[in-house]
Regions:
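N-terminal Rossmann-like dinucleotide-binding module
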Residues: 1-47
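Active-site loop of classical SDR/Rossmann-like NAD(P)-dependent oxidoreductases
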Residues: 12, 280-294
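Beta-loop-alpha module in the N-terminal Rossmann-like domain of NAD(P)-dependent dehydrogenases
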Residues: 50-110
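Hydrophobic residues in well-ordered beta-strands that form the structural core
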Residues: 54, 93, 118-120, 257
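Rossmann-fold dehydrogenase core element
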Residues: 106-124, 144-147
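Predominantly a Rossmann-like dinucleotide-binding segment in NAD(P)-dependent oxidoreductases
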Residues: 125-205, 210-212
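Contiguous beta-strand/loop segments that form the cofactor/metal-binding neighborhood of enzyme cores
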Residues: 189-261, 290-304, 320, 336
């Protein structure tokens, strides 16, 4: 039985992760800490047998642990990951894993030195509709994927639980790392990579269309070049509706996602599946966490592969997108 603890116990931890940990018989949460002391009551209500620790050091060195589940704001991830790895613990971290390429390289090296698992929460791949997409692509239903067209529309940034006196960290550059590119773009990137392959280049434009009082972009447009074609991602917090749409073109057919419906049209067959919930329904996705936890535990106990390489590539692609946008949208090649 693995013993774990939360670093950060906001809504994502309480509503998105905790139900999944409670459902497992091979791992359990025994403690937590958060910069907001007010989260103590919420944690103890969710985990009556758990212990609340007043600091990260108190947690790391005052508990007997096998892993930590980091659900703190992204700007703190790199330092927290390194501290946990240095303490000999496996680490599961919410996305984005880190906020810079340099930090991505550093935590990957730290995991290798510590010989511990570092795994990112790439939970959208566990959504029923995304699992169905992956299965259809893997069985060759549309042949080689040429392009993915991804749309995420939101009307505003999500509100995050913060320490007293701290504003919403999602729109704080120091804590979020970036605007919607980090918040929703990270999900889009690992999904597109899973279906279309690893990009070799990227071009992007980051804009502020509505929330001009905030220092981060509320809209992002990315083109990703792969060996078979070019995929496009559009993300905005400045829409008039909340929705997601996906269109995937293959050499032998296409897959479309509208709401919770998946539609397949190919040379060999056609099909339609209802795969609730839709990607735009809810925010914490507790039902998508089970597969993430299973993969993490398998990596920690049975030497299964973690998704660290995928997470590092997400960081590299976001860096390329930021550099592209700063240069007017020029294409940036990913080396190596």
């Amino acid at each position: 039985m693995l013993r774990g603890a939360f670093i950060g116990f906001g809504n994502v931890a309480a509503k998105g992760h905790m139900p999944g940990w409670r459902a497992r018989d091979d791992a359990r949460i025994v403690a937590a800490t958060d910069a907001a002391a007010s989260r103590r009551e919420a944690f103890l209500a969710a985990c009556p047998d758990g212990r609340w620790r007043d600091s990260v050091d108190d947690l790391l060195f005052g508990e007997t642990l096998d892993f930590v589940d980091i659900c703190a704001p992204p700007g703190s991830h790199a330092a927290l990951i390194e501290r946990a790895l240095c303490a000999g613990l496996h680490v599961l971290s919410e996305k984005p894993l880190v906020t810079t390429v340099e930090d991505a390289k550093r935590v990957a090296a730290a995991a290798a030195r510590a010989r511990r698992v570092l795994h990112a929460v790439h939970n959208w791949l566990e959504a029923p509709i995304c699992r169905k997409i992956s299965a259809l692509i893997d069985e060759g239903a549309i042949g080689t994927v040429r392009s993915v067209r991804w749309r995420t529309l939101r009307t505003q940034p999500a509100i995050a639980v913060s320490a007293e006196g701290v504003t919403n960290w999602r729109v704080d550059p120091a804590m979020a790392g970036g605007g919607i590119l980090f918040d929703h773009g990270w999900h889009a990137l690992y999904c597109v990579m899973r279906w279309a392959g690893v990009p070799v280049g990227a071009a992007a434009r980051l804009e502020t269309r509505r929330f001009h009082e905030q220092p981060l972009e509320d809209t992002a447009t990315l083109d990703l070049d792969t060996a078979a074609g070019t995929s496009n991602i559009f993300l905005t917090w400045a829409a008039d509706e909340r929705s997601n749409a996906i269109e995937i073109e293959g050499e032998d057919g296409e897959i479309r996602v509208v709401g919770d419906a998946l539609i397949l049209k190919s040379n060999a067959r056609e099909g339609r599946w209802c795969c609730p919930p839709s990607l735009s329904q809810g925010s914490h996705h507790a039902d998508w966490f089970g597969g993430v936890a299973a993969d993490f535990v398998a990596a920690a106990t049975r030497n299964a592969r973690s998704n660290l390489d995928e997470a590092v590539l997400c960081a590299r692609l976001i860096d390329a997108a930021q550099r592209s946008s700063a240069a007017g949208g020029v294409r940036v090649t990913l080396a190596g």
